[in-house]
Swiss-Prot record:
CDD domains tied to this protein: GIY-YIG_UvrC_Cho
Predominant localisation class: cytoplasm
Compartments, record wording: Cytoplasm
Role description: The UvrABC repair system catalyzes the recognition and processing of DNA lesions. UvrC both incises the 5' and 3' sides of the lesion. The N-terminal half is responsible for the 3' incision and the C-terminal half is responsible for the 5' incision.
Protein name stated in the entry: UvrABC system protein C
Binding partners and assembly: Interacts with UvrB in an incision complex.
Domain UVR: 200-235
Gene label: uvrC
Residue pairs linked by disulfide bridges in the UniProt entry: none
Amino acid sequence: MDQIDISCIPTTPGVYLYKDPAGKVVYVGKAKHLRRRVASYFRDIQRHTPKTRAMLRSAATVETLSTTTEKEALLLEASLIKKHRPRYNILLRDDKQYVLFQLTRKHHWPRLVLTRKVRKDGSAYFGPFTSGQAARQTWKVIHKVFPLRRCSDKAFRNRVRPCLYHFMNQCPGPCVLDVDRDGYMQMVRKVEMLLAGRSTELIDMLRADMQAASDALEFEEAALLRDQLQAVERTVERQAAVLPGVHDMDAVGLAEAGGGLALSVLFIRRSVLLDKRNFFWSGLTLEEGPEVLLSFLTQYYGPGSFIPPRILVPWDIRTEDREGAELAPAAVCTDAGLLPDTPLLPDCPEAAPLPAAPVFAVSAGDVMPSGHDADPAGTADAPVVRGDSAPEQPLPAAVPPLCAEESASGSALRAVAEMLTELRGGPVRVLPPRNATDNQLVTMATENAREDARAEKRPDVAGVIAAKLGMSAPPVRIEAVDVSHTGGSNTRVGVVVFENGTPARDQYRTYAFADDEAGGDDTGVLALWAVRRVHSGPPWPDLLLVDGGRGQLAAVMTALESAGAGGLFAVASIAKARNEETGRADRRAGNLADRIFLPGRSNPVNFKSGSPELLFLQHVRDTVHDYAIGRHRRARSGAALSGELQRMQGIGPATARLLWEHFSSLQEMVDAGEKGLAALPGIGKAKAAVIHEGLKRLVG
């Protein structure tokens, strides 16, 4: 990129966007002082990191957007990164938030549900959990011990008879029965105490209630309380405290290992290490640490995510006019040991194994309009773990660096804290370690990041793919396309996206084609799709992978060139392995050598069978294949639903879908009778009679 006229750039806070010659955004950054920040890119270029130098080589222009405050610049930067997915920014997958427990306290009859979004609706939220399966198992166990209602609010309003869970003694049936609300709310409070980690208090309450019921000769009630008490006590045995007196917070650690930069975030709730999440960026070093940390904080804790009241980070980051962001003294380990000038941690202990996340132990995450960091009593209900679950030697007390609220006005963490405070609706503190306890948590996160990077071998798959396919740079964004139809009907083209080797499910797309337009011709449909893809615009892939052979590849290339997108990105196709004798696709008997074709080349590219790069391309192809088939089957099912059932009186799309979800055939619907149909949510006796009569005529 040539030198630009710096005098045209404003001196306000804001966001700058570097664009390549085609106008594609390749990097988004924020600055407290736009002119000085942009000017820093053109001073002593050789001192920049390799990634920054590569970005400057690919950039042709730079644009700026001014804001009034640095906090607004952070919000705008996060929004633009999510929109443009720039090649040289640190990108996090945001297709799926982690699982949370939501207790709908504002409802007259609260229920406990699993959710991935935090809403300011008065509910209490607990978590997060990275394993949805473990969270669902926990949810089932909680309902067996404390049988709250399970039905949705809509089903609750429309239900006319108790559901099956009531007859299994797993729901009191407040939807239609006269249930003691005081007793129900007492059960809700017990669930909240369990999820909030107040196990000791809950056990004492259950034991007292059990004794009172026994003294009153209410032995059935006493037996129920005994079962609840035993279940809670078993739960407490599985809980493990990281540090006594530590409450709701996340601890972030970074380490340079495994040929890249690893980041780990620990979720700590009520002294319990609830879960953790690891990230890795190949080719980065601790020189990019400040950028990685700031980008992580602004992307990971976005709108709708769970934001704790306190976030520990490895360093303070001060925004300097001359260079954007630089580190305060760091407490970070590398493969070679500690970085110079790290007074917080005098040594780098061997990594201690992290305590396993409790199967049934969850904790408080209530989002309140006015936040409260921790229990003022400072008590920890879970037992303190000794031995291997925590560092054996306590870290020495450190001179506390300035936290976000106390630091100089130039601290980038202050702007991050202000942004997260606004999103959370309560105070959020983002700060480096201030004492030995904080040091221990950050060290644990740092060591966990390093060990995860070392344990997982990460071959340079993208680099090998780029070399094999003749690409100028490793592909960051890969799009794969496949067609699915049944005899030319309900044709669907599925597109999946992989970024940095992981699926970007929020960017999956489905393209529908009319039967007369598709005609059952896969190559023709792919050509039509290619034109529509060009018209939809960026973000463009670095590599487009077509599921098919030379014919499908040629059709896509011809369409791209006619649409003016020839050479805009690399294109290849992947075809299943074929039997040498029959010429038919055959992946049996270990024949995994699928063939990769390039435009203008008759013979396939030589990929070693079973190599990581070929297995990755096969995984991408299998993903788009399954996705396209799934979308086609959904379209075919929808057509069947609208065909048979919706011609009947009293059945619309919602009722038709409800019937097909509960029955596998029309005959099963008839056999269920009016009583069975009326038991479905939203279908009363009168409607069930009409539907049953229509079904009998339809079946004949």
